Amino acid sequence: MSIDIDWERATSGPDGELLAERIRSFIHDKFQQMVLPRFIRSVQVTSFNFGTIPPELEIRDLTDPFPDFYEDGDEDLSVSSEEQSPMREQADRYRERIDSWQANSPGGLEVQMSGRMGFGHPLQLAPDEDGSRLHPLRSPINLGDINPYLFPRSGTPGIPGGTSNLGYFMPLSGLSGSQTPLRAVTRGNPFSGGWPDSPLENESRIGHGQGPPRRRSEVNVDAIQSRPSTANTGNTLFSRGSVSTGDPRHSHSSQTVLANNPGQAPEANDSPVSAVPPLSGTPPRRMREQKAEDFQVFCRTKYAGNISLSLTAEILLDYPMPSFVGLPLKLNITGLTFDAVAVLAYIRRRIHFCFLSPEDAYALIGPETGGGGGDTMEPNSLRRKNLSLLRKIRVESEIGRKENGKQALKNVGKVEKFVLEQVRRIFEEEFVYPSFWTFLV
């Protein structure tokens, strides 16, 4: 069954001009993303015209829509975003609270969180944060053999080696095993909590007469046996929920809440990111419900009209030196001819449109009768010929200025070949299934 189209009404007027401008802008953006050859500096798409000759349409079959057409799209993404808005607002409020604590609290976030988490003692801060000095060394470690030039300290009668202001969590950088209480570290007594895994981490921060400042995640040694650690509490207590909107065809939301176990102290070197591994994998596709009024039409489409596409390319001349001068080249693509099977699906105020490749068209609706009336196109012949949906494309080129009614240069073969190949590629990648276009009606 053939269909007549009022081509002039469909392509003229404000709506037709707007559609033509959108197609021109789309093709122009595709050319800007391409890697141009060395002899072409730039390509600009200047105009697109539908012409006056309509295509010939013939309905071949009426079936149910493809499953890909039922996949969630932009409309479902907006609905899911609205459903997630209360959760996102709550996450923003919590985040604003934490930011206000960090900005207004003189002692930092750890002091605030220690009281709000129900612990009896505030966190012990570094000396450079609250102005207090570290506690003197109260361990029975013999530091008499340490080089006094490394750690100068005043001599005190009755105390071997004198006093020191080195704290419990001191990294004795560069010391040998005989001078470092490795046995105490390996046995897991209270001295082991503050020894770093690598003594080279804070080697550059050891100064004369004062040990390195402790990290903010370290707690008071007096309470190390009586209450759990709240290391990195401010960073890992809450993580904002994120809604992924990278792909408009897939939408998912993830709300991640990270909290330390109150009965178990985290590792000293664990970062907030590594506390909970990131979610991996793509969520399953969300499909719409199929309804009885959904339908799909296979339509044989033949076109041999005067649709036109105008481009301007700047080519580079390498004489007498590389990229010596650039010449504007005007290309007018017209005389487009194609013969393909179009798919038109209607699903709840949406129209999905695409073309089928020759092999897919043969598998779905059978062989097509050629123009002679008797020959058929078999899939093996399609593979051998590697037929494109665009059977013919005519291009008219103009380069340089016109002198006495004649062009200075014309028919630049390399540029024409490149532009035609890219036009074919754009058409086949953007309009041939599984790629398709969706229109809201």
Swiss-Prot record:
Keywords, in A-Z order: Endoplasmic reticulum, Lipid transport, Lipid-binding, Membrane, Mitochondrion, Mitochondrion outer membrane, Transport
Span of domain SMP-LTD: 1-441
One GO CC annotation: ERMES complex
Region (Disordered) residue spans: 180-289
Residues in the signal sequence: none
Cellular location(s): Mitochondrion outer membrane; Endoplasmic reticulum membrane
GO terms, molecular function: lipid binding
Top-level taxon of the source organism: Eukaryota
Example GO BP: phospholipid transport
Comp. bias (Polar residues): 226-245, 253-263
Membrane-topology annotation of the record: Peripheral membrane protein
Purpose of the protein: Component of the ERMES/MDM complex, which serves as a molecular tether to connect the endoplasmic reticulum (ER) and mitochondria. Components of this complex are involved in the control of mitochondrial shape and protein biogenesis, and function in nonvesicular lipid trafficking between the ER and mitochondria. MDM12 is required for the interaction of the ER-resident membrane protein MMM1 and the outer mitochondrial membrane-resident beta-barrel protein MDM10.
Quaternary context: Component of the ER-mitochondria encounter structure (ERMES) or MDM complex, composed of MMM1, MDM10, MDM12 and MDM34. A MMM1 homodimer associates with one molecule of MDM12 on each side in a pairwise head-to-tail manner, and the SMP-LTD domains of MMM1 and MDM12 generate a continuous hydrophobic tunnel for phospholipid trafficking.
Domain notes: The SMP-LTD domain is a barrel-like domain that can bind various types of glycerophospholipids in its interior and mediate their transfer between two adjacent bilayers.
Family indicated by similarity: Belongs to the MDM12 family.
This protein's name: Mitochondrial distribution and morphology protein 12
